Amino acid sequence: MSGHSKWHNIQGRKNAQDSKRGKIFQKLSRELYMAAKQGGPDPSGNPSLRLVMDKAKAANMPKDNIKRALDKASDRDAANYDEVTYEGYGPGGVAILVEALTDNRNRTSSTVRVAITRHGGNMAAAGAVSYMFDRKGYLVISRDDLDVDEDQMLEDALEAGAEDMQTSDEAFEIYTDPKEFAQVRDALEEKGYKFVQNELTMVPQNLTPIPEDKVEKFQAMIDQLEDDDDVQEVYTAGDWPDD
């Protein structure tokens, strides 16, 4: 994992994502609904819900939207969703994982397949790609107005129980074992750190450079996948070229 900057690749796609704010809120509403339905509406006793609520707040999701999603979870007649993961390769042979929440597996499987194959990729069998990724806790702390140098940040992160840290000009990226994520997050919060992002994510063991002549197709594939109402997350092993 050392040397891999998830933040660099996120920033490489940020402008495209900023135009999808309404779609992001819709997906977060579904995640909030499912987390509350499965574990109850109180985030203090439902770690999964707290994670999604942190994610919603980081996305500046309106409080009314959050409340509606949580209220809906108490409706016994409301829809239920299955968690499904699809595996494949995008343009240039770059590994991708697609996580979805769906009430119709056939529909979602079809739309995911179309999005991937239309742009020169292909679907893969279960397990063909997922072994290339590790589940990790992921925390991002912006360096803006942060009066802490890299050595101090690393010391605090390791003391809290983190596994690894990556540094860029913009941020510190902290990776944890998923089982230790809440402990690390809470310990750093107690020290006064604020997170730009904090979540459980899938981190590629190795990055694959996206060929420059494939970048446009790769981005178009991700855009189409993220436009799908059922798709919650798209993870790639792609290393985006610098602008």
UniProtKB/Swiss-Prot annotation:
Record keyword Glycosyltransferase present: no
GO molecular function: DNA binding
Positions of the UniProt region annotated as Disordered: 1-23
Record flagged with keyword Protein transport: no
Ranges annotated as spanning the membrane: none
Keyword terms, alphabetized: Cytoplasm, DNA-binding, Transcription, Transcription regulation
UniProt subcellular location: Cytoplasm
Domain of life assignment: Bacteria
Organism: Lacticaseibacillus paracasei (strain ATCC 334 / BCRC 17002 / CCUG 31169 / CIP 107868 / KCTC 3260 / NRRL B-441)
Family matches, as HAMAP family: Transcrip_reg_TACO1
Gene Ontology process terms (BP): regulation of DNA-templated transcription
Coarse class of the protein's main subcellular location: cytoplasm
PANTHER family: TRANSCRIPTIONAL REGULATORY PROTEIN YEBC-RELATED (PTHR12532:SF6), TRANSLATIONAL ACTIVATOR OF CYTOCHROME C OXIDASE 1 (PTHR12532)
Family: Belongs to the TACO1 family.
Protein name: Probable transcriptional regulatory protein LSEI_1022
InterPro entries in alphabetical order: Integrase-like_N, TACO1_YebC-like_2nd/3rd_dom, TACO1_YebC_N, Transcrip_reg_TACO1-like, Transcrip_reg_TACO1-like_dom3, YebC-like
GO cellular component, one term: cytosol
